């Protein structure tokens, strides 16, 4: 007895040579060479490079403004973490 496959796949013909092409909705063409694209810093960057004179070294997070401080962890949260989530509040 011969089995008959119940799924009928449609023919899908692929190109023999896959070419890089832009997305149809792209507003710009692809560059001729991809090796020159990532060769330097982004051209749209507006931030100046950090120099030792302008950068600030902080050794403790508490020296930073409050928005950079760690949020306090309650005892109930610690119990939940230590129990692997099996702790009910």
UniProtKB/Swiss-Prot annotation:
Disulfide bonds: none
Keywords in alphabetical order: Mitochondrion, Transit peptide
Nucleus in keyword set: no
InterPro entries from the UniProt entry: Kgd4/YMR-31
Stored Pfam families: Kgd4-YMR31 (PF10937)
Main subcellular location: mitochondrion
Protein name as catalogued: Alpha-ketoglutarate dehydrogenase subunit 4, mitochondrial
Subunit structure: Component of the 2-oxoglutarate dehydrogenase complex (OGDC), also called alpha-ketoglutarate dehydrogenase (KGDH) complex. The copmplex is composed of the catalytic subunits OGDH (2-oxoglutarate dehydrogenase kgd1; also called E1 subunit), DLST (dihydrolipoamide succinyltransferase kgd2; also called E2 subunit) and DLD (dihydrolipoamide dehydrogenase dld1; also called E3 subunit), and the assembly factor KGD4. Within OGDC, interacts (via N-terminus) with E3 subunit and (via C-terminus) with the complex core formed by E1 and E2 subunits.
Family statement: Belongs to the alpha-ketoglutarate dehydrogenase component 4 family.
Biological process per Gene Ontology, one example term: tricarboxylic acid cycle
Transmembrane regions: none
Function: Molecular adapter that is necessary to a form a stable 2-oxoglutarate dehydrogenase enzyme complex (OGDC). Required for incorporation of the E3 subunit (dld1) into the E1-E2 core (kgd1-kgd2) of mitochondrial OGDC, and acting as a stability factor for the fully assembled complex.
An example Gene Ontology CC term for this record: mitochondrial inner membrane
Record bears the keyword Mitochondrion: yes
Subcellular localization(s) per the UniProt record: Mitochondrion
Domain of life: Eukaryota
